[in-house]
Amino acid sequence: MNTMTLTPGQLSLSQLYDVWRHPVQLRLDASAIDGINASVACVNDIVAEGRTAYGINTGFGLLAQTRIADEDLQNLQRSLVLSHAAGVGDPLDDAMVRLIMVLKINSLARGFSGIRLSVIEALIALVNAGVYPLIPAKGSVGASGDLAPLAHLSLTLLGEGKARWQGEWLPAQAALKKAGLEPVALAAKEGLALLNGTQASTAFALRGLFEAQELFASAVVCGALTTEAVLGSCRPFDARIHAARGQQGQIDVARLFRHLLTDTSAIAESHHHCHKVQDPYSLRCQPQVMGACLTQLRQTKEVLLAEANAVSDNPLVFAEAGEVISGGNFHAEPVAMAADNLALAIAEIGALSERRITLMMDKHMSQLPPFLVKNGGVNSGFMIAQVTAAALASENKALAHPHSVDSLPTSANQEDHVSMAPAAGRRLWEMAANTRGVIAVEWLAACQGIDLREGLTSSPLLEQARQTLRERVAHYTQDRFFAPDIECATTLLAQGALQRLVPDFM
C-alpha cells in the first residue's frame, strides 16, 4: 500500500493521482502541528473573551446575525453537520471519497481553520483504515463550498450515517468499531471548517483531468495509427510548421506524432512518392486541434493543483493577528471554469477521433475496402461501429455546455451567486466514458486498416499498439458480434495500454 507524508499545501498531481487510484497510508508532517494548534488557540480566545465571530458563536448563512450561547456551541456544530447532510443520488465510489478526504485533510492542516489536531487525525484514521463515508453524488452548487457532500463525509466522524468498510455498507458506528476507531465530538468552529470548502468539486474535476490525460494520449496514438492506415503524410508534423506559429501545445503535439511516426515505417515508405498533395483536416490538423486540447489540459492542471492545495474554508483564522475574517474562498468558480474548459477538450478529442473513423470508412478517401471489411455487402464491417462513435461524440456536444455561467441563489439570497462546479466536474466522467468509446472504435478500425495493407508494418511503437490490441481482439475476416470488441478495447484504454506509449506531455 502506498505511504504518503502529507506536507499541507504541497500535494503534487502525481500524489493526487495515486490517492485516486490506490488506497493510501497517510501521515501528517510534523511541521503542520504548530500552525494547527495556533489557530485553535485563537478560536478558544475568541470564545473565552466573548467576542462574536461568524461560524464560531453565530448561526450560519442568513442566520449569521444570531448569537449562540457558549453552552450551545458544541451542539451548534453537530446540528450543522446533521442538517447539511442533505445530498441525493448514487454514493460516490471509494476512490472519489478517498480523494475528497485527502483534499479536506490537506486544507484543514494548513492551520487557517481553527480545527483541532485530533479531528484532523480522526480524518486521517478514516483514510488509513479504509472507512469510506457514504457521500451522495448530488446536492452541492459549489458555494458556500460543497456543504452537502462534506457534511455526509463528516457524519461518519460523528458516528452518524453510513460508511463502507471492506466493501460492506454499515452504520457509521459499526464501521468505526470494526476499524478500531471512535466517534469525535466537535468543538467551536469545527463543523463549519469540515463543511466549508471546495474539496468535492475539486476531486470531481481532478478525476476528469486524470481521465482526460489518458484520453489525450490514447487519441494521439490512434491518430497516428489512422494516419498510417489511410496512407497519410507525415509532412504536416514537421517541426518548422509549428515553430512558425508558436503555439506551445501544438509544437509539443507535433513532437509526439514525430515520436510515433518514425522513418522505420514500411507503410510510410510505401507511399513516400505518391501523388497526394494534402490530407483531410482530421489528419493534417491533428497538432493544431490536439495542441489546443493539450493547452486546456495544462491550464486545468494549474488551476486544480492550486485549488487542491488551497484553504477554501470560511471564515479563516489568522492566528498571529488573533483575527477571524469572513471571505469567500469557498466559491468554486475557478474549478467550475476549469472543468468547463476541460469539457471542451474532452469533446474535441472525441470529435476529431470520430472524423478519422469516418475517413477510414470511405473507400475513396482511405483507399481501403468499404467499412474495412472484404466481401462488402455480405459483410457490413465497421458500418455501425462508426455510428456508435458518432452517437457518443454527439452526446458530448450537449454535455460540453458550460456550467459556470449558470447560477441559482440559495440560503434566502444570502448566497446569491454560486459556481455549479460539482456538476461541471461530475459530467466530465460521462464525457470521458463517451470519448473513450470513440477512441476504442478508432483503435479497432485503424488496426484493421493496417492489417489490410497486406503485410506492411508501421513504426515500432505503433506496431506495439497494434499488437496490444491483437492479443485480445482478432482481425475481422467476416462479421461477428461487435460490442464485446469495443468493450475490450475500452477496458484496455482505461488501463493505460496506449497512454504508456506516449512520453510525458503535461
Swiss-Prot record:
Entry EC number(s): 4.3.1.3
5-imidazolinone (Ala-Gly) crosslink site(s): A143-G145
Intracellular or extracellular location(s): Cytoplasm
Gene it is expressed from: hutH
PROSITE patterns listed in its UniProt record: PAL_HISTIDASE (PS00488)
This protein's UniProt keywords: Cytoplasm, Histidine metabolism, Lyase
2,3-didehydroalanine (Ser) sites (modified residues): S144
GO process terms (BP): L-histidine catabolic process to glutamate and formamide; L-histidine catabolic process to glutamate and formate
Top-tier EC class: lyase
Pathway membership: Amino-acid degradation; L-histidine degradation into L-glutamate; N-formimidoyl-L-glutamate from L-histidine: step 1/3
PTM remark: Contains an active site 4-methylidene-imidazol-5-one (MIO), which is formed autocatalytically by cyclization and dehydration of residues Ala-Ser-Gly.
Record-stated family: Belongs to the PAL/histidase family.
GO cellular component: cytoplasm
GO molecular function, one term: histidine ammonia-lyase activity
Catalysed conversion reaction: L-histidine = trans-urocanate + NH4(+)
Annotated protein name in UniProt: Histidine ammonia-lyase
InterPro entries in the record: Aromatic_Lyase (IPR001106), Fumarase/histidase_N (IPR024083), HutH (IPR005921), L-Aspartase-like (IPR008948), Phe/His_NH3-lyase_AS (IPR022313)
